[in-house]
Amino acid sequence: MRNTFLEFEQPLAELENKIEQLRYVQADSAVDISDEIGRLQQKSQTLAKEIYGKLTPWQTALVARHPQRPYTLDYVREIFTDFHELHGDRMYADDQSIVGGLARFNGQSCMVIGHQKGRDTKERAARNFGMPRPEGYRKAQRLMRLAEKFKLPIFTFVDTPGAYPGIGAEERGQSEAIGHNLYVMAELKVPVIVTIIGEGGSGGALAIAVGNAVLMLQYSTYSVISPEGCASILWRSADKAPEAAEALAITAPRLKDLGLIDRVVNEPIGGAHRDPRVMARLLRRALGDSLRQLQDLTPEQLVEQRLERVLAYGRFQEVRG
């Protein structure tokens, strides 16, 4: 699949096009131009490193939404084995914007739950663009309770612009479903490890993000509102989204400094979508480290530690001049 380039990546796109053209020439010619191709590839890597080394928060938000970025099921295939998907909330329907099921992580049984967007138009519509309805959150809740019953660690993957705001979702209790998930996750007596892999949009993200350890990929985002939504409220114009992104503190390093996440997982040069397998290997290692740190804790200690994390949200220190 050809890479899709964002607006700020245009110099990189032009260089990649030159490399592609030279490959076609080499295939049809007896002239060896492999050295020139290698030189341009090295230049492309250097340029990508420069561009991604100074991303603004708004550019990071664009990378987090990249259409080729790995989704939950991509990581499930690369990191877990024996995945068996479970469906439905046992009350209304099966929401495909949240996927989950039993799997093995490094040979250990576990439960995996995550938001899932789509790759093409048909799948995006079926998965509601990764925006869960109440039945999606209730499905996640059911799987968490099942994991607790069998004493299985839980891995969740967050990637949503937010909970679906449709009339039907509100009628079926969207806010209740999100709120109840927070309550349930806070008291689970098994390890819960959360990873923000793309967009972490508001309560729709938080509903599966109350964990003992919260990891965040380097170019993912996590915020109470999208930059465009914030700009529309404050400045009455979505054009101010870059300024809103700066003020919202949506990036992984800022959130780590604020104590809202525990670990930033570095991505390959150019983002996770440039090399999904390398990204999966890096994430597998980080997940393994987190699980090892939690496995010696008793159920009571797990609950206490998780509650301490949640109650620390919003703490501040007042400094008087």
Curated annotation (Swiss-Prot):
What GO terms are given for molecular function?
acetyl-CoA carboxylase activity; ATP binding; carboxyl- or carbamoyltransferase activity
Pathway linked to the protein: Lipid metabolism; malonyl-CoA biosynthesis; malonyl-CoA from acetyl-CoA: step 1/1
Give the record's GO CC terms.
Answer: acetyl-CoA carboxylase complex
| Pfam families the UniProt entry points to | ACCA
The reply to whether Plastid figures as a keyword in the UniProt entry is no
Catalysed reactions, as listed in the record: N(6)-carboxybiotinyl-L-lysyl-[protein] + acetyl-CoA = N(6)-biotinyl-L-lysyl-[protein] + malonyl-CoA
Q: Which UniProt keywords apply?
A: ATP-binding, Cytoplasm, Fatty acid biosynthesis, Fatty acid metabolism, Lipid biosynthesis, Lipid metabolism, Nucleotide-binding, Transferase
The residue ranges of the CoA carboxyltransferase C-terminal domain are 39-293
**Where mainly located?**
cytoplasm
- Under which EC number(s) is this enzyme classified? 2.1.3.15
Q: Where in the cell is it found?
A: Cytoplasm
InterPro entries, per this entry? Acetyl_CoA_COase_a_su, ClpP/crotonase-like_dom_sf, COA_CT_C
State the protein's purpose: Component of the acetyl coenzyme A carboxylase (ACC) complex. First, biotin carboxylase catalyzes the carboxylation of biotin on its carrier protein (BCCP) and then the CO(2) group is transferred by the carboxyltransferase to acetyl-CoA to form malonyl-CoA.
Q: Which family does it belong to?
A: Belongs to the AccA family.
Q: Which NCBIfam families match?
A: accA, AccA_sub, PRK05724.1
SUBUNIT field: Acetyl-CoA carboxylase is a heterohexamer composed of biotin carboxyl carrier protein (AccB), biotin carboxylase (AccC) and two subunits each of ACCase subunit alpha (AccA) and ACCase subunit beta (AccD).
Q: What is this protein called?
A: Acetyl-coenzyme A carboxylase carboxyl transferase subunit alpha
Per the record, the gene is accA
